[in-house]
Amino acid sequence: LLPFGGEADLYLVAARYKKQPRLFFVHGNSEGISWKAAPGMGLRATATGTLKLDSVHVDSDAMLGDDTFNYQAFIDLGQLHWCALAIGACQAALDYLIPYVNEREAFGEPISHRQSVAFMVANIGIEMESMRLMTWRATALAEMGKPFHRETYLAHVLCADKAMEIGTNAVQLLGGHGFTKEHPAERWYRDLRVLACVNSGLHL
């Protein structure tokens, strides 16, 4: 799936050139390009869809970089962007949950006084910090020009796994309100669930 593909004037397309993965700039009005909207359960604001290229020709200067271009590093940086998205959405969920569980009352007291609720919120904070630190470590190595593929993979797996869990728990903590449109938790759940599916998914 490609975000904002129907609105793009220029695409960055991965293809093989001389048996090596490379990136090419392709104009959106090139002959042979077609776009089909494919709305998903999450990330609806990005207007996702599928892009089809049928015998599309590009000029020789459309290729990004030279023979030293590090395709794997490019992919890894993209993974870190997805990690940052997950962390931001999880932080939004936590910021919403804390006042909710402190103000929402059941059986004469805030639901945050229940240990099961308090532990769940605390675990979200702990898991978020681990997601953030793993992503920062991989990003720092990348900025220093050091190998960062391993750290990126670890951050991606952690963020994809914990993002699903945090999204689910955010809905659960809101109870019956969690799956209504009156509260944003259901949207965060859908967006965070996508992260385990995109970019080859959680288990590949």
Regions inferred by a protein language model and the residue ranges of each:
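Glycine-rich phosphate/pyrophosphate-binding beta-alpha loops
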Residues: 1-5, 77-82, 193-201
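A short core secondary-structure module
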Residues: 1-33
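Glycine-rich beta->alpha junctions and the first turn(s) of the following alpha-helix
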Residues: 35-129, 195
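C-terminal helix-coil-helix/basic helical segment that borders enzyme active sites and/or dimer interfaces
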Residues: 98, 102-109, 125-158, 171-176
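Residue-level recognition of alpha-helical structural elements
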Residues: 110-113, 117, 148-151, 181
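Amphipathic alpha-helical coiled-coil segments
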Residues: 162-170
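Glycine-rich phosphate/cofactor-binding loops in nucleotide/flavin-utilizing enzymes
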Residues: 174-204
